[in-house]
Amino acid sequence: MSQRGNRKTQVGVVVSDKMDKTVVVRVSHLVKHPVYNKYIKRSVKYKAHDTDNSCKTGDRVLIVETRPLSKDKRWKVRQIIDRVE
C-alpha cells in the first residue's frame, strides 16, 4: 500500500452549511505582535468538501488538505470532533 505523503490537517468550526456538499470552516490561531509582544487571535475561512452533508453549523471538524475540487475548495472534512445539538 503506497502512501501519498503527509497532508496538512486543521481543526476548525463550521460557520456555514448552506451549500450542497460544501461547508465553510473557520480555523483560528494566535499570532504574536512583533512590537507589542501581545498575542492576537487570527482566523481563516476554508471551504471544505462534505460528502454526506453531515456537518451542521457549530460543529468542530478535522479537515485535511486535498487536490483542488473546485475554484475555492482544497480541503475535505475527515471527521466531526464535536457535534452541536
From Swiss-Prot:
Going by the entry's taxonomy, the superkingdom of the source organism is recorded as Bacteria
UniProt similarity note: Belongs to the universal ribosomal protein uS17 family.
One GO MF term, please? Answer: rRNA binding
Q: Which organism is it from?
A: Geobacter sulfurreducens (strain ATCC 51573 / DSM 12127 / PCA)
Keywords from the UniProt entry: Ribonucleoprotein, Ribosomal protein, RNA-binding, rRNA-binding
For this entry, list what GO says about its biological process: translation
What lineage, starting at the top, does this entry show? Bacteria, Pseudomonadati, Thermodesulfobacteriota, Desulfuromonadia, Geobacterales
Q: What does this protein do?
A: One of the primary rRNA binding proteins, it binds specifically to the 5'-end of 16S ribosomal RNA.
Q: Which GO terms describe its cellular component?
A: cytosolic small ribosomal subunit
Q: Which gene encodes it?
A: rpsQ
* Name of a matching Pfam family: Ribosomal_S17
Do you know which InterPro entries this protein is assigned to? NA-bd_OB-fold (IPR012340), Ribosomal_uS17 (IPR000266), Ribosomal_uS17_bact/chlr (IPR019984), Ribosomal_uS17_CS (IPR019979)
User: What do we know about how this protein assembles, alone or with others?
Assistant: Part of the 30S ribosomal subunit.
- Protein name listed in UniProt: Small ribosomal subunit protein uS17
